[in-house]
């Protein structure tokens, strides 16, 4: 399958950074290949996203102050490339963006709205980071608990606490809950719509992911790296290397 990313104005990013973000997410939904010589291939789109990062680690829709939602969305798009050792710029970009988001979370654990919390939950799950347990995102409560505090008695979510339920906040919260569940079950990322990982693939991934926390010296790191290299390329992107520094 091939997909050609283009638009009438020959600029995917005319609307802003989210144009590049959704272009990459679209390509990766089914692992589409871009035609040889395409102007907007994966490398070009990745370059555009990473080069747009602000000095504080965040991203913005266009040039200006970093935005929590856009930063989280950028992470969702580039997360599948974190384990690509040929793209050290992606790994550094992810690290800075995660640090930026951690610093923007308030003392109660929220980012200020149901939508922002939802987008960050999706981003963290895409990176293999647990929103309920990672110390960078646990303040007086964890991020997932903070997001759920926006849910009303009618089942919907509100933009602000105490507000009326609305479709946008509820829809994004549902996506975040789905992302969290898929993370817990070692399933594909929410925007990865290829055939689901098999039971055997999930068992292999759970095995290597469980070893990552035990890496304490060069020998244990080499053993983990061998297990990583033994995986199919399709599986490697789901190894949670973002939890360690290699």
Predicted region positions:
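Short, small-residue-biased leader/transition segments that mark boundaries at the very start
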Residues: 1-5, 246
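Well-ordered alpha-helical scaffold segments within catalytic/enzyme domains
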Residues: 2, 22-36, 73-87, 119-133, ...
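A glycine-rich, coil/turn loop motif that links secondary-structure elements
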Residues: 8-17, 58-68, 90-91, 106-117, ...
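Solenoidal tandem-repeat scaffolds enriched in leucines and small polar residues
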Residues: 19, 28-85
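Short sequence/structural elements of tandem HEAT/ARM alpha-solenoid repeats
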Residues: 39-44, 88-96, 136-142
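Terminal, non-catalytic domain-edge segments
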Residues: 143-146, 161-200
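Beta-rich interaction/scaffold domains
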Residues: 194-244
